[in-house]
From Swiss-Prot:
The gene is rpsO. This is Small ribosomal subunit protein uS15. Keywords: Ribonucleoprotein, Ribosomal protein, RNA-binding, rRNA-binding. It comes from Polynucleobacter necessarius subsp. necessarius (strain STIR1). One of the primary rRNA binding proteins, it binds directly to 16S rRNA where it helps nucleate assembly of the platform of the 30S subunit by binding and bridging several RNA helices of the 16S rRNA. One of its GO terms (molecular function) is rRNA binding.
Length: 89
């Protein structure tokens, strides 16, 4: 259920600060969002899969921590990323 390599490369290319950037918070949040979005339909079909749900909650909390860090460091970048990923209604 991992995000495909081609999709990962596309996400990294769209959100990277420089050519070889894979570790910036923007890239990490975007990759986590893609993984979370891929797992969400699984839990609608498999409501009793608590072990995988625990992993999903860890990903969500990691994304939340990265977003909090980004909000403290660069508010404009944070707002642009939230808008781009559609995380807030």
């Amino acid at each position: 259920m991992a995000v495909a390599d081609i999709k990962t490369a596309k996400i990294v290319k769209e959100n990277a600060r420089s050519a070889n950037d894979t570790g910036s918070p923007e890239v990490q949040v975007s990759l986590l969002t893609a993984r979370i979005n891929e797992l969400t339909p699984h839990f609608k079909a498999n409501t009793k899969d608590h072990h995988s749900r625990c992993g999903l909650l860890k990903m969500v909390s990691r994304r939340r921590r990265l977003l909090d860090y980004l909000k403290g460091k660069d508010l404009d970048c944070y707002r642009a990323l939230i808008e781009k990923l559609g995380l807030r209604k």
